[in-house]
């Protein structure tokens, strides 16, 4: 038996006519789908199963009402919840007791729209096939089957930080028209299974969904303890750091105009982070080698369209909703197949939004993926204590990672400006 508790600002359409009690305009954006029933997913991992079931439930609920004309302060505090008990009919697919909560559903709906992501494509990318586990330094890290979205398990403290900064983040995205190197936050959820809470943050994948990354760096502009460990370096795709970048004489070869646009965007984003007293962020740099990428790989990963069955998770998603033009959403990266075929190193900039191709005449034919990550750390008492401890250990002049937000930003920008050839 399912029971849901939803605040007045998010009354489900089952209990109110679309738009009733809301300040919504009668005219809405054209949607290419018809409403589907929530499908039940089957997953070996109960957490993943409940998460995907909850996302489908949430998107279906949101599709019942038009988006608000403007977001109100209450939208940044709102949440929608559903609690399911004695779910015996689907006990082989889902736990018999679970809870699912979406934070600020209207805000993230608006953010998805501003980032050019349709809700039904978002749903398909997340749920048509099971997400796969990926290596993440902190907590669990999943990637959607079409590789356009990442699902990061975060702490309750991260959720609290996101909550406190969400209004500022949304305002900034509106101001810059979504043209940013910041992470594109698309959804924030809590999943409760066996009385344990897990918190999930969904973001756009900064790397390409079709061009594999052959090298990657996490750059902070600090040189102390900023070299990948021997254990990290033996991985198939290690996360290298600042000292590795310098020791390898690595450079980023992009055109002057692309460099100018990138640095202007970076400076604007970093100024925003300084205003919020945020630090410890990194530039994530992924490098796709076009020559290597065009060579067939003997033991490369099997692409979704080539594989049979539903994979180890056994996850079954909903059929794609039928569109008003007789089409079905194909996920965030799906529409690329209806356009011209892409050659080696080519990409669609509206999907691979963090990608820049190397300049003509560059010594290496490469595609670079560059974006800011780990932007939730604010300068607080813990950081102040860590800074004091590192100053004692390394000396006041050392290039240590924990400094004041303004110092961090200056050092970070100085370093990133010099990664270009």
From Swiss-Prot:
GO cellular component terms given for this protein: endoplasmic reticulum; plasma membrane
SUPFAM superfamilies membership: SAICAR synthase-like
Span list, region Disordered: 294-328
Reaction equation(s) it catalyzes: a 1,2-diacyl-sn-glycero-3-phospho-(1D-myo-inositol-5-phosphate) + ATP = a 1,2-diacyl-sn-glycero-3-phospho-(1D-myo-inositol-4,5-bisphosphate) + ADP + H(+); 1,2-dihexadecanoyl-sn-glycero-3-phospho-(1D-myo-inositol-5-phosphate) + ATP = 1,2-dihexadecanoyl-sn-glycero-3-phospho-(1D-myo-inositol-4,5-bisphosphate) + ADP + H(+); 1,2-dihexadecanoyl-sn-glycero-3-phospho-(1D-myo-inositol-5-phosphate) + GTP = 1,2-dihexadecanoyl-sn-glycero-3-phospho-(1D-myo-inositol-4,5-bisphosphate) + GDP + H(+)
Enzyme class per UniProt: transferase
Listed Pfam families: PIP5K (PF01504)
One Gene Ontology term of the molecular function aspect: 1-phosphatidylinositol-5-phosphate 4-kinase activity
Ranges annotated as biased composition (Basic and acidic residues): 294-304
Modifications the protein undergoes after translation, according to the UniProt entry: Phosphorylated, phosphorylation is induced by EGF.
Domain annotation PIPK: ranges: 43-420
EC number of this enzyme: 2.7.1.149
Required for interaction with PIP5K1A, as annotated region: 69-75
Localisation per UniProt entry: Endoplasmic reticulum; Cytoplasm
Signal peptide extent: none
Modified residues (N-acetylalanine): 2
Role this protein plays: Phosphatidylinositol 5-phosphate 4-kinase with low enzymatic activity. May be a GTP sensor, has higher GTP-dependent kinase activity than ATP-dependent kinase activity. PIP4Ks negatively regulate insulin signaling through a catalytic-independent mechanism. They interact with PIP5Ks and suppress PIP5K-mediated PtdIns(4,5)P2 synthesis and insulin-dependent conversion to PtdIns(3,4,5)P3.
UniProt-recorded name of the protein: Phosphatidylinositol 5-phosphate 4-kinase type-2 gamma
Species the sequence originates in: Bos taurus
């Amino acid at each position: 038996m399912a029971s849901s508790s939803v605040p007045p600002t998010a009354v489900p359409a089952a209990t109110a006519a679309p738009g009733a009690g809301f300040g919504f305009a009668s005219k809405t954006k054209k949607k290419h789908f018809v409403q589907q029933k929530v499908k039940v997913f089957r997953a070996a991992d109960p957490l993943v199963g409940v998460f995907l079931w909850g996302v489908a439930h949430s998107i279906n609920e949101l599709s019942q009402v038009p988006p608000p004309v403007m977001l109100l302060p209450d939208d940044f505090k709102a949440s929608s919840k559903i609690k399911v008990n004695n779910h015996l009919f689907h006990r082989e697919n889902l736990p018999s007791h679970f809870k699912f909560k979406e934070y600020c559903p209207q805000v993230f709906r608006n953010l998805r729209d501003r980032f050019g992501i349709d809700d039904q494509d978002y749903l398909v990318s997340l749920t048509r096939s099971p997400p796969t586990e990926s290596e993440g330094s902190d907590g669990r890290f999943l990637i959607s089957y079409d590789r356009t979205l990442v699902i990061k398990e975060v702490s309750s403290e991260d959720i609290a930080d996101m909550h406190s900064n969400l209004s500022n983040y949304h305002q900034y995205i509106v101001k810059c028209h979504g043209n940013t190197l910041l992470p594109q936050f698309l959804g924030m959820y809590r999943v409760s299974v066996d009385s344990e809470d897990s918190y999930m943050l969904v973001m756009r994948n900064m790397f390409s969904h079709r061009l594999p990354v052959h090298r990657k760096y996490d750059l902070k502009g600090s040189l102390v303890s900023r070299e990948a460990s021997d254990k990290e370096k033996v991985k198939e795709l290690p996360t290298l750091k600042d000292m590795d970048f310098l020791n390898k004489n690595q450079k980023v070869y992009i055109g002057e105009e692309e460099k100018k646009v990138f640095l202007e965007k970076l400076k604007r984003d970093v100024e925003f982070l300084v205003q919020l007293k945020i630090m410890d962020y990194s530039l994530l740099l992924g490098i796709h080698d076009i020559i290597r990428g065009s060579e067939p790989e003997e033991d490369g990963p099997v692409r979704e369209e080539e594989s049979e069955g539903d994979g180890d998770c056994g996850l079954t998603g909903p059929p794609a909703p039928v569109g008003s033009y007789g089409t079905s959403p194909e996920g965030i990266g799906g529409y690329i197949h209806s356009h011209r075929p892409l050659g080696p190193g080519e990409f669609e900039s509206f999907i691979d939004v963090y990608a820049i191709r190397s300049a003509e005449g560059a010594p290496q034919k490469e595609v670079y993926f560059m974006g800011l990550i780990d932007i939730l750390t604010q300068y607080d008492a813990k950081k102040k204590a860590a800074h004091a401890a590192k100053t004692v250990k390394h000396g006041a002049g050392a290039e240590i990672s924990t400094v004041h937000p303004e110092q961090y930003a200056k050092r970070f920008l100085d370093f990133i400006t010099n990664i270009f050839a």
